[in-house]
Amino acid sequence: MTASQDFVVKDLSLADWGRKELDIAETEMPGLMAAREEFGKSQPLKGARISGSLHMTIQTAVLIETLQALGAEVRWASCNIFSTQDHAAAAIAATGTPVFAIKGETLEEYWTYTDQIFQWPDGEPSNMILDDGGDATMYILIGARAEAGEDVLSNPGSEEEEVLFAQIKKRMAATPGFFTRQRDAIKGVTEETTTGVNRLYQLQKKGLLPFPAINVNDSVTKSKFDNKYGCKESLVDGIRRGTDVMMAGKVAVVCGYGDVGKGSAQSLAGAGARVKVTEVDPICALQAAMDGFEVVTLDDAASTADIIVTTTGNKDVITIDHMRKFKDMAIVGNIGHFDNEIQVAALRNLKWTNVKPQVDLIEFPDGKRIILLSEGRLLNLGNATGHPSFVMSASFTNQVLGQIELFTRTDAYKNEVYVLPKHLDEKVARLHLDKLGAKLTVLSEEQAAYIGVTPQGPFKSEHYRY
């Protein structure tokens, strides 16, 4: 990046390819296109300066251009070192949008690019964050705490924290007071995924959340669609592109049976694998059993599994002791947000052979090997291209509505985590029905009164479980 070049992409010449795919994606993203139609004239995001940290894919490019069509200024980075689609990043950079994203970033590059989404040419701060996983939010909040004199940078717990803390110190030295000023300018954050939402709720519980947040993940039209149906298509896609393995007849273990785990188990079962599930939650375990999956412990299943996938959002789900028990050439991957579900750090002293980008063969001292996908990071985005456009349209329409809500009605919200109201959730679903040829039945006034709703909805209570 030069002084006159406010972007970092792999190859700007890929922009034409990216634009062609972006044009196709728009036809599969009716929610975002409807948002442009509904809000384009009123420009509700005029004045918004959005720092976006979310996988820089073709689908995200459509989101970015939707935010801009509604009046926002945007700076963008990917929220994962492997998830960028370089042609998508090039297409966005070619329009003059500052984007900092390359497939296969180092951790140093990743945190430098995260810093760059807050560095506006006029020196003024961002006033909105659009986040996926919480890294952009945590970057600002940890930095502000360090500026306040808290000892938060002296004891990194991982290689990633070492790099993060170094980047914070670098910015503090270059721009004293930057983090505090930036934190105080934020009107709100919209958070895409389970992991990031958990971080926000922890901050709220500790009284450390300095601005309102909208939990996009728990919109029904996100968690029950993106997390389930998206994973149902993209997990097997990532494993196939990474390994070309025949999945029919193989034993696959899915660790976790939340929404992502449910979609992942169905994905593997649909490919013909014999699927087993591990769970800590008795309700989810019972669901898995009654959906026809054998519920096991990883300790018991380790030696017979051909494919093992983590979906939990927790740490140390697959330990080095588990991996020592795995079969020769077992495929190991993760579709949760961070790389700590698998103890990848414990493998670093073993023999690694890079087969191709995001596919590594790791050999144990006894000669046994495992295939690790995307170094334990999101394999559906590292080894493939993530979820299809249609399901991401629902998720990203929620993001757009959340950004509008927090930017235009900031004073209506306390420094807490909120979920979009039911009528907006139903609106997002409604916008996607025509594309699938689905037609809604309309309640009569009498029918609506009988169940205590209006013919236009909302049709379910806030606590209804879909």
Curated annotation (Swiss-Prot):
InterPro entries linked to this entry: Adenosylhomocyst_ase-like_sf (IPR042172), Adenosylhomocysteinase-like (IPR000043), Ado_hCys_hydrolase_NAD-bd (IPR015878), NAD(P)-bd_dom_sf (IPR036291), S-Ado-L-homoCys_hydrolase_CS (IPR020082)
The record's subcellular locations are: Cytoplasm
| Superkingdom of the organism of origin | Bacteria
What this protein catalyses is: S-adenosyl-L-homocysteine + H2O = L-homocysteine + adenosine
Report the coiled-coil segments.
Answer: none
Q: Which UniProt keywords apply?
A: Cytoplasm, Hydrolase, NAD, One-carbon metabolism
In the record, biological process GO terms are:
L-homocysteine biosynthetic process; one-carbon metabolic process; S-adenosylmethionine cycle
Which sequence ranges are marked TM in the entry?
none
Which residues make up the binding site for NAD(+)? 193-195, 227, 256-261, 279, 314, 335-337, 380
For this protein, the Enzyme Commission number is 3.13.2.1
- Keyword NAD in record: yes
Gene name linked to the record: ahcY
Q: In which pathway does it act?
A: Amino-acid biosynthesis; L-homocysteine biosynthesis; L-homocysteine from S-adenosyl-L-homocysteine: step 1/1
Q: What is this protein called?
A: Adenosylhomocysteinase
Q: Which SMART domains match?
A: AdoHcyase, AdoHcyase_NAD
Which EC class heads this enzyme's classification?
A: hydrolase
Residues that bind substrate = 57, 132, 192, 222, 226
- So what family is this one in? Belongs to the adenosylhomocysteinase family.
Q: Which Pfam families match?
A: AdoHcyase, AdoHcyase_NAD
